[in-house]
């Protein structure tokens, strides 16, 4: 089986840090940097070090470069060994930074020839399911990039297949490895912000027009009749959706009872670049996430937990938390993060629980499915966006404030008076409700609008 070449991202993430950092305020847990299989506190050499697990990386360009650097970091720590790279066009020595390991465009054959125990799959969205099942058929464990699939049916085919094969599968929502996630859940459970009333998420990013031309599937909802479902909420800012659902305690498919979407675009693409979604959960608390790739200025995305007597803001790329509650001054906390590949190795060696199983992304995949089934994103009026001179990008004036307001008030764009959206109560362009359930706005009161803490 061959794999399509990995897709370059417009702005790849920096290489992983060489060693985990100290984490004041982090929740108790595994010691950062500990070697899976080693006995904590044992004298050097007292416990035999496990053999490094052979890893094959499918997709080593674009965002795959981050995974390549991470695998090499863990290789230096003796946890894994990079056994092979699957690319249609092999990496050169200059790209790899030396002599690369075995390379092949045939993913299945490469898994077999290298004896891989783990496959890291970072390929175009619509190839994920087939590659995951190819690994599962060979008993190879998986770290599968997000989004795990372009539709709920493909997700179920993947999840059921890996479960039947008995392999471990981790979905690559790196933010869910943050120690801030369980810490925030504990604060909410302890009543730190009163009764939780809803979760907001905000992502205001900028992307040049070339971003949507970086690969044949970029900016597409379908390619050659196959679902792709690229888009602001399903791909670049998917972490905001998944993290908001995780903090709401609504991660499984059955936790979702209704979804409203508003999908728009300033670019000449099929997919959305400015969108929002409101999820009604079985708990009755709304989860609203707004995103744009046409911001006036780039900002760090965040998730906001609303309560009757306070709020908690989580900048998930920074592992930074701000707690604001009645009767207390603001408290800022910084947390560590467990790398998801390292957690997968730990699971295989010591039996440690996986952090992001396929079932724990079922609610996210319900959002992807709602976006897939929604009307195609509506083009914004020409007067609603402008080009930035010398920057080759499009901006929607005022969208930064709308994204923040959506997270603050749990509202959709059409309810916030956006000049390019219809008033609340009318069918906004590109909008859809995927359930007959009452809307989240009807089922839970909005907290008063507050100043954004971005």
PLM features: residue spans?
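Beta-strand-loop-alpha-helix segment that lines the small-molecule cofactor/substrate pocket
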Residues: 113, 118, 124-125, 129-176
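Glycine- and charged-residue-rich phosphate/anionic-cofactor binding loop of Rossmann-like
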Residues: 80-82, 350-363
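N-terminal Rossmann-like dinucleotide-binding module
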Residues: 2-5, 45-98
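Predominantly a Rossmann-like dinucleotide-binding segment in NAD(P)-dependent oxidoreductases
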Residues: 176-259, 267
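Contiguous beta-strand/loop segments that form the cofactor/metal-binding neighborhood of enzyme cores
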Residues: 235-320, 327-354, 368-372, 385-436, ...
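Short acidic-hydrophobic, aromatic-tinged amphipathic segments that line or gate anion-handling sites
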Residues: 102-106
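Conserved acidic residues
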Residues: 83, 101, 117
């Amino acid at each position: 089986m061959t794999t399509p070449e990995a897709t370059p991202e417009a702005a790849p993430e920096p290489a992983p840090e060489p060693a985990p950092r100290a984490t004041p305020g982090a929740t108790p847990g595994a010691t950062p940097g500990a070697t899976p299989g080693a006995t904590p506190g044992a004298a050097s050499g007292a416990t035999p070090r496990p053999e490094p697990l052979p890893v094959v990386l499918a997709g080593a360009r674009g965002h795959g470069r981050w995974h390549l650097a991470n695998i090499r970091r863990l290789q230096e720590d003796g946890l894994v060994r990079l056994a092979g790279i699957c690319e249609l066009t092999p990496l050169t020595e200059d790209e790899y930074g030396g002599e690369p390991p075995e390379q092949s465009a045939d993913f299945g054959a490469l898994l077999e020839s290298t004896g891989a125990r783990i496959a890291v799959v970072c390929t175009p969205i619509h190839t994920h399911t087939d590659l995951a099942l190819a690994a599962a058929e060979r008993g190879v464990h998986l770290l599968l990039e997000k989004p795990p699939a372009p539709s709920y049916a493909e997700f179920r085919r993947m999840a059921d297949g890996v479960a039947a094969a008995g392999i471990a599968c981790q979905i690559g929502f790196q933010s869910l490895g943050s120690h801030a996630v369980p810490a925030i859940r504990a604060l909410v459970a302890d009543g730190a912000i009163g009764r939780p009333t809803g979760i907001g998420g905000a992502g205001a990013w900028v992307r040049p027009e070339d971003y949507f031309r970086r690969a044949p599937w970029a900016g597409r909802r379908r390619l050659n009749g196959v679902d792709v479902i690229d888009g602001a909420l399903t791909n670049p800012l998917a972490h905001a959706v998944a993290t908001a659902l995780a903090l709401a305690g609504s991660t499984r498919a059955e936790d979702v009872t209704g979804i409203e979407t508003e999908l728009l675009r300033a670019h000449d693409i099929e997919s959305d670049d400015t969108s929002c979604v409101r999820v009604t959960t079985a708990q009755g608390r709304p989860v609203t996430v707004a995103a744009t790739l046409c911001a006036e200025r780039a900002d760090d995305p965040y998730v906001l937990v609303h309560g009757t007597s306070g709020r908690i803001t989580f900048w998930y790329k920074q592992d930074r938390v701000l707690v604001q509650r009645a009767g207390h001054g603001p408290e800022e906390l910084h947390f560590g993060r467990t790398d998801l590949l390292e957690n997968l190795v730990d699971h295989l060696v010591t039996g440690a629980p996986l952090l992001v199983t396929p079932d724990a992304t079922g609610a996210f995949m319900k959002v992807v499915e709602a976006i897939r089934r929604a009307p195609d994103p509506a083009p914004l009026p020409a007067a609603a966006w402008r080009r930035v001179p010398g920057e080759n990008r499009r901006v929607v004036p005022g969208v930064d404030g709308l994204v923040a307001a959506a997270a603050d008030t749990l509202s959709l764009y059409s309810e916030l008076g956006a000049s390019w959206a219809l008033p609340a109560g009318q069918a906004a362009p590109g909008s859809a409700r995927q359930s007959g359930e009452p809307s989240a706005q009807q089922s839970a009161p909005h907290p008063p609008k507050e100043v954004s803490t971005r």
